[in-house]
Amino acid sequence: MGGAKPRSWVVQAVVFGLVLAACGGTSVEVSDFCESVVETEAAISSGPGDDVAVWAGQLTETLTELEQLAPDEVAGAVGTITGILLPAIESGSEEALFAGLESTEFGEAAAVVDGYMTDECGWQVADVTAVDYQFETDLGGLEAGYNGFAFENAGTEMHEMALIRFNDDTTETIEELFELPEEEAFSKITMPGASFAAPGDSDTLFVDLEPGRYAIVCFLPVGATPDNIEALESGELQGPPHFSQGMLEEFTVAG
């Protein structure tokens, strides 16, 4: 974890940053929809692992359920999102998936869903602002359950908010964790979600948090801008990760 960010982590960051946000609601229908979106993001974040077919099947199932549960106010936007993602998943092409995720149509539809979720779901939402190179936020007082993170990039570079949960038996601080070999470090954490935003953009991430120790981290390399997104995604862009410049913060979620 101490070196330049691997391509797989960039891929997850971009996907999380572009995939619609979720929430919990004031009616059964809204609540079901919001929780379905959380499940969808969790399926995406898990990645294909060793069995792409199983992952694709699970993600297809969650997206189909999401479309069925969508309230009338966002049915069109959700239909646009699933109409972009499902064919790309079926094709098995990462290029097709990213072309869809980066399309104007997807971005506009995701923004509609974001707005609906923020207004209707009724979960606690913490504001997180990214600057070069730190997070400006107060994450004290978070409690277990569904929570939102309204992520805004006020910096000049691209930033992400990677949400990390320390395993219950992990004793290292986030700084100490990054001194360990990458494989050992990753064995001590899980990653419930992430948001990604270009300068001036924002994204809202909703996750179901368990009690425990957490941190938010930016893994993107120094120098990451919208002008070199292809080099970033391919892993060609080299530079110290933003967390090495101070872009990381620990917090605790109460039970």
Predicted segment positions?
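Alpha-helical segments in soluble extracytoplasmic regions
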Residues: 32, 36-86
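Extracellular/periplasmic metallocenter environments
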Residues: 122-125, 130-134, 142-144, 156-158, ...
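Beta-strand signatures of extracellular beta-sandwich domains
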Residues: 160-164
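C-terminal motif of bacterial Sec signal peptides marking the signal peptidase cleavage site
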Residues: 19-22
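C-terminal amphipathic alpha-helix
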Residues: 30-49, 93-125
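Bacterial signal peptide processing site
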Residues: 24-26
